[in-house]
């Protein structure tokens, strides 16, 4: 049976980088037929039409149709998978509260449209930043959709962390397992080497603590800014790749721990209801579970408190703005 995949901000750089990979079967598998729905703001609809033309011109066997709209109700109607990529970027002189409010005007109505029109088995990935709190807004405005269906992307942070560690140790990325990121998708995030393994060895035992704390953690957290500085534009292909990884493993399963920002049920002391990145096991079928009993020592706890504190501040700000109850 065909699946409907809705992509917002479809005419943007990440949208352009991801749509062809979805249509080729890299996200939902090589046998899954699909229909794409592209949601864009009115001024970008013509660009989205051009992308749709190219998608058709690729003659992907799995792609049944491409629909383009500026109406969230149409875009999310019958959607099985929603990739919320479109977001308001921070502009010069903008305070964080302004950014949260601007994005609230996007993610509040999208949450409602998902609630009212998406398929019963919908799964949602928020990519647009600030991703954790945008996810919180959408989730809180979709009260009829189980909150386990909503997630925000921290897989790009994980992929960056894995690659940097592999380069440091001179190993392949496939030798690094269970390396996850906790907390917010921001420079406060905490990449966890205590529970990660490299060729079966504890990752934290293979590096100097000084390097871990003062070089590795800050560089993972600020990698996005480093890329903007180098190429004059934000990460697009790597963000698209991480979104593919996230949804593929969520739907089809994975044999390693991975990072997903999901609603907390109080695990590891993270306040109930906050959308925080956690380590997750992914059995497939759009399910996830947060494992118990992972090592969270004093160092990790101190880092967690900082990033969770930031998430609480963002939550309180959007609550004050009336974007969540």
From Swiss-Prot:
The reaction(s) this protein catalyses: (S)-malate + NAD(+) = oxaloacetate + NADH + H(+)
Lineage: Bacteria, Bacillati, Actinomycetota, Rubrobacteria, Rubrobacterales
Xref: PANTHER family: MALATE DEHYDROGENASE
Gene it is expressed from: mdh
Biological role stated in the UniProt entry: Catalyzes the reversible oxidation of malate to oxaloacetate.
Biological process (GO), any one: tricarboxylic acid cycle
Enzyme nomenclature, EC number: 1.1.1.37
Residues involved in substrate binding: 90, 96, 129, 160
Keywords: NAD, Oxidoreductase, Tricarboxylic acid cycle
Top-rank EC class of the record's enzyme: oxidoreductase
Protein name: Malate dehydrogenase
Active site (UniProt): 185 (proton acceptor)
Keyword NAD belongs to the record: yes
